[in-house]
């Protein structure tokens, strides 16, 4: 092959590589720009825009009540979005045209922190505005879902609704046997005897049990207040 042909192929290859890289960069920049544009557009669509007249706000609690996992409006993951729901209730509180909340619950429960925070926000709504909440329990309104439901002045349920489960659970895995079998040794250096709980001592089990008991008692008190019952009556039903 002649030198001129070789040089021509090398130049053509270089041009192809540069063009390809430029194309990738251009596509990436275009995609990022488009994502930013769509994010801005959707953020505007998600702004609180209530009706001009009196209305009832619908608060959907669907899915596991837990920390918000949606990091962007472009995230299409479904399920309960905690921060969004809390902000929405705040907006309803501040709007004088809002006359109440229809609370739609379809949740098997969730984390203690988010469940109680949602409950407290709904109670704050009622106490601040004096407006009612009507609860409808769909497929599930169990555990944290039930904690949320009892904020309703009126509670309605389908005949097939699964509800109740007034309790608290804390769980984990003891993998020490597996580690020993695989020859894996776990080492930790701590500042206190209870800092490391990889191998639970009786004292640590007692500490965790006291936390569970405290959360359970708070759950019982919430249900008792919401259902106009005594704590003993609730515990008798909870089992």
Question: Which residues are covered by each model-predicted region?
Answer:
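Glycine-rich beta-to-alpha transition loops that act as phosphate-gripper elements at the mouths
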Residues: 134-142, 237-239
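Secondary-structure end/capping motifs
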Residues: 219-239
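Small-residue-centered hinge/linker elements
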Residues: 2-4, 12-129, 140-226
């Amino acid at each position: 092959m002649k030198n001129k042909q070789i040089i021509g192929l090398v130049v053509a290859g270089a041009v192809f590589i540069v063009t390809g890289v430029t194309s990738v960069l251009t596509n990436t920049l275009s995609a990022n720009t488009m994502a930013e544009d769509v994010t801005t557009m959707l953020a505007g669509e998600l702004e609180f825009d209530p009706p001009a007249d009196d209305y009832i706000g619908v608060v959907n609690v669907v899915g596991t009540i837990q920390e918000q996992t949606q990091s962007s409006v472009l995230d299409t993951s479904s399920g309960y979005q905690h921060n969004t729901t809390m902000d929405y209730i705040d907006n309803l509180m501040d709007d004088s045209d809002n006359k109440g909340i229809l609370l739609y619950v379809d949740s098997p429960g969730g984390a203690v922190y988010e469940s109680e925070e949602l409950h407290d926000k709904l109670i704050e709504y009622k106490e601040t505005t004096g407006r009612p909440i009507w609860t409808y329990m769909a497929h599930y309104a169990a555990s944290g879902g039930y904690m949320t439901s009892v904020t309703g002045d009126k509670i309605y349920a389908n005949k097939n609704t699964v509800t109740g489960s007034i309790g608290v659970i804390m769980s984990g895995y003891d993998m020490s046997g597996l580690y020993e079998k695989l020859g894996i040794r776990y080492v930790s250096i701590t500042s206190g005897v209870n800092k490391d709980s990889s191998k639970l001592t009786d004292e640590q089990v007692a500490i965790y049990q006291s936390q569970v008991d405290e959360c359970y008692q708070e759950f019982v008190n919430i249900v008792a207040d919401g259902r106009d019952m005594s704590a003993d009556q609730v515990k008798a039903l909870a089992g």
